[in-house]
Amino acid sequence: MKKVALVTGAGQGIGKAIALRLVKDGFAVAIADYNDATAKAVASEINQAGGRAMAVKVDVSDRDQVFAAVEQARKTLGGFDVIVNNAGVAPSTPIESITPEIVDKVYNINVKGVIWGIQAAVEAFKKEGHGGKIINACSQAGHVGNPELAVYSSSKFAVRGLTQTAARDLAPLGITVNGYCPGIVKTPMWAEIDRQVSEAAGKPLGYGTAEFAKRITLGRLSEPEDVAACVSYLASPDSDYMTGQSLLIDGGMVFN
């Protein structure tokens, strides 16, 4: 029987790459996304290629929706083994521009979404009578504060703390909790960050990317597949003796 994973924010970008990689690794995958159309498109692509996937619409900031999505995946795909709490938003937020609305939106998705995902996964693992793997999207910005990204960066510091605490709390249940910390990845989300940062600096598109890219030791932007390969490891038995860690997969932007 195939193992089952649910990936949030899997309708595009890093989430889609993770879903495709997990299918390649032998998982049946629930494509969970706020955008129902993109989720269905990714699930269809997987199914047509001979894999097994289902689409589920979810707003990760809504606890009930997250629990319902995980339960739907468990029942439809026949089990539950891994959750990847990947969904997130990253608006440019110079300190003086931060509003209560921006803080609420980012924290509701990036932080609460991870908490609800952790809780829903634990419930599903208990119903299945075994442990499992919880994998959270952090960021290099969750290790080192990034300019112009105060709210996003602080939300990812929070995710790293949640990952460590959950790892300690859930170890007795046979559940590991780890994170992955991308750098600059060629995705629609990064294109929007570049637009906002470039615009705020009064520079042409690409300025933001160029400024951040100066810090990449390997000298290139990340492909979504680079991140998916890291998550593949965290979802596999090879990482069974790892918990509470947030792995940097950023091309050498941050060294710890």
Swiss-Prot record:
Matches recorded under InterPro entries: 23BDH, NAD(P)-bd_dom_sf, Sc_DH/Rdtase_CS, SDR_fam
GO biological process: acetoin catabolic process
Binding site for NAD(+): 6-33, 59, 156
GO molecular-function term, one example from the UniProt record: diacetyl reductase ((S)-acetoin forming) (NAD+) activity
Active site: 152
Tagged with keyword Plastid: no
SMART domains: PKS_KR
Protein role: Catalyzes the reversible reduction of (S)-acetoin to 2,3-butanediol in the presence of NADH.
Oligomeric and partner information: Homotetramer.
Protein name (record): Diacetyl reductase [(S)-acetoin forming]
Source organism (scientific name): Klebsiella pneumoniae
